[in-house]
Amino acid sequence: MAGASSYFSLRRLLLLLLPLVPLLGATTAAAAGANSSVTYDHRSLIISGRRRLLISTSIHYPRSVPEMWPKLVAEAKDGGADCVETYVFWNGHEPAQGQYYFEERFDLVRFAKIVKDAGLYMILRIGPFVAAEWTFGGVPVWLHYAPGTVFRTNNEPFKSHMKRFTTYIVDMMKKEQFFASQGGHIILAQVENEYGDMEQAYGAGAKPYAMWAASMALAQNTGVPWIMCQQYDAPDPVINTCNSFYCDQFKPNSPTKPKFWTENWPGWFQTFGESNPHRPPEDVAFSVARFFGKGGSLQNYYVYHGGTNFGRTTGGPFITTSYDYDAPIDEYGLRRLPKWAHLRDLHKSIKLGEHTLLYGNSSFVSLGPQQEADVYTDQSGGCVAFLSNVDSEKDKVVTFQSRSYDLPAWSVSILPDCKNVAFNTAKVRSQTLMMDMVPANLESSKVDGWSIFREKYGIWGNIDLVRNGFVDHINTTKDSTDYLWYTTSFDVDGSHLAGGNHVLHIESKGHAVQAFLNNELIGSAYGNGSKSNFSVEMPVNLRAGKNKLSLLSMTVGLQNGGPMYEWAGAGITSVKISGMENRIIDLSSNKWEYKIGLEGEYYSLFKADKGKDIRWMPQSEPPKNQPMTWYKVNVDVPQGDDPVGLDMQSMGKGLAWLNGNAIGRYWPRISPVSDRCTSSCDYRGTFSPNKCRRGCGQPTQRWYHVPRSWFHPSGNTLVIFEEKGGDPTKITFSRRTVASVCSFVSEHYPSIDLESWDRNTQNDGRDAAKVQLSCPKGKSISSVKFVSFGNPSGTCRSYQQGSCHHPNSISVVEKACLNMNGCTVSLSDEGFGEDLCPGVTKTLAIEADCS
């Protein structure tokens, strides 16, 4: 169990032995006795007879590889987590009806054991509908085609399959004795997902379905409570929970249930063609502090590590292959600083008052028009206060218990003894890490040479079906591939061609199309994350007589949620040609021939054992700007042990594999220059995904994570399928590495030692504020690029001196830090000497390189 007890004083520990209040609405654990019971009352989850304040972290096992799991879980624990939470991904585990898969990235038991071995609890969100920006919301596509099946309503075929899979997962966990009632570590389970927001759209079948789902879950006899997020009418004893950027005002639907937050979004997902969302750590911390101050007892970050949508697992549609989410642990498994460390310090500060928060009495004190205190006191004399300033513009000085406190706008100060500020959400003490992607050209990796395979434009092999008019793309492919060829022929009277500007008009439900006329590419068109359907006009050169039109329809992930989402289709809906003496040729009702997938897919050219397939044609130099081309090249392992990304900026759009492992869809689609980006990010005020965006005018995703465990010591095969055309000679592997570290700390920042603080200390617990810098293991601070002690301004890599600057700044910092792996610099007078700017609040800003 993650470390809460280390923060308790002896007196507080003794109080845990006192009789507990009667438990209301509790679910009683079954088999393993009181020591493993998980129940709840109105205040919190109760584990082994003790109320618990819990920090939970979402890590989705299929979005990383098993070799990464131990480090990810360890980073969550080091960040202050008590729990790891994950969805269960039905379509990954049952890709065909009755055929189960629990290997490699989908080895749920292995992942759960790693969590258990780390001493953490687990929250299992079975769903089995999960949304999660995962293709088809995690539900298998084959289920949509099971006779009579309608998803997520009072439909017997759907409920039968849902119950069968839920039972399969529960039985698997029981077999491993993972539920807390068996002495294991799973303390909560979830059924369904955010259905309350959909009920109105589903009509009369909605409520009976929701009540059935709850009843079905309870009948599984797990011995632990069940939750339903965003399910406002969740029946007792199922706990309804909150998902949002802020949940401090949330109230459960019964006074007997505790206040749980299953999804606090520390960032947001990204779609191809848009800029990058960023949620400032100050605002994430603000939301968490407000939640616990207002009586919350379990909070989960969705997601703490987002990872990667490998292969064709992205949803949306148009969700990027990266599921980085601006999470505290980035896509590559590295700490995102300062976010990770700022939240770690927040968790420590809250945990200092855990007993008082859970067993004490609460009161509310107004400190001003938009300033307030939530105060908790217990019988032992414990006192914890959350001082809040919800004004989004103005800093305030407030008086609480005869003391003055500085409260920045949109911030919360945590006082674990109602006197000393242990943490303020707006004052970030942690260093910032600046990451670089360091390239290693494929040519420098002893490349054996390139081979290619060119796709035919249109029908290859036998025709799969012929129809007058259009078929739906997804209904035809059953999501076995992204690709479906639509091909037709038509005759043109030569007398109608003279002087005309001929235009091809295409309408599509989504998601993308490439058009070929008479075996030549004439254009491409795409929808986007906010609108999958599109129409496009392309100039064409017709010829007298017979013309052949081949349209390649493409999907970019399937719909992952929304009312009746399984009926969202894709594919061509209208094709016309204009420009012939005011005559329009409507091809929509023509005879169309269809071919599912690509020839290279049929021959599995992406598989590791297909490297010597005779269809591969060796090339001394790979062709450039060639559409519909497969590329194969042998590569060495990038040096070092840094995480690796595949730089695809030189390519168009397609799919990539290493040694048969599906890296995923790549598409360095450029976001608009005007896509909501701002020169600076103000954390203050309510956050939305449209705020604090970055990367306008840049590729949405340039680098694609390639786990190091996918590389062999030698003889690695990289396979690329390129749809549009690009320059494969400029593809590189890049190592993700720390380039520089920055810090910006003022003298009034909280400086209590959170590891050793005790509320019974006789002094105020304060030392001078400090800047702490550290480079990764094996690196040291090689140069100090900027330093100013005074009133500097700016952000990392753009700091500027202010009107107050101490001349000893550089010498003090270089003496402490240069050639060191890490260093600490105090903002005390002893360090910098004479105060040259009396009355000015001193700040120390540093930027240093690591090498």
Swiss-Prot record:
Keyword Lipoprotein annotated: no
Major enzyme class: hydrolase
Residue positions the entry lists as glycosylated: N35, N361, N475, N528, N533
Localization (cell): Secreted, Extracellular space, Apoplast
EC number(s) per entry: 3.2.1.23
Keywords carried by this UniProt record: Apoplast, Glycoprotein, Glycosidase, Hydrolase, Secreted, Signal
Protein name (Swiss-Prot/TrEMBL): Beta-galactosidase 3
Taxonomy of the source species: Eukaryota, Viridiplantae, Streptophyta, Embryophyta, Tracheophyta
